[in-house]
């Protein structure tokens, strides 16, 4: 927080909040939420952290479908230039009959 120019008194006040202070109650959740916030400048890292830990508890935006995407789909050229391997890989990520689905979880994505 110091790197963003936040005053020391404000940092102390923030860290003293029960939703932030580690006190044995939901500590892993608190750490996960703070890590997610710390990744704010790097959205992809925050997205990965959320998928890895499940924190914070996020909901999909209205009109975004059922859920927040869990992975990026393969690029449009992959099935053109490497159809055999693309098909094998995309089949592993089939959800609801959709091959190469963004709703499929990768191996480290927390269920």
Positions of PLM-derived features:
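Acidic/polar-rich alpha-helix caps and helix-coil junctions
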Residues: 1-111
């Amino acid at each position: 927080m110091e790197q963003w120019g936040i005053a020391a008194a404000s940092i102390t006040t923030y860290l003293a909040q029960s939703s932030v202070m580690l006190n044995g109650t939901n500590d892993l959740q608190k750490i996960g939420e703070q890590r997610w916030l710390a990744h704010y400048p790097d959205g992809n890292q925050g997205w990965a952290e959320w998928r890895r830990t499940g924190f914070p508890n996020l909901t999909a935006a209205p009109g975004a479908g059922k859920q927040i995407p869990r992975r990026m789909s393969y690029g449009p050229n992959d099935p053109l230039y490497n159809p055999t391997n693309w098909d094998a890989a995309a089949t592993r990520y089939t959800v609801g009959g959709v091959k190469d689905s963004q709703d499929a979880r990768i191996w480290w994505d927390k269920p």
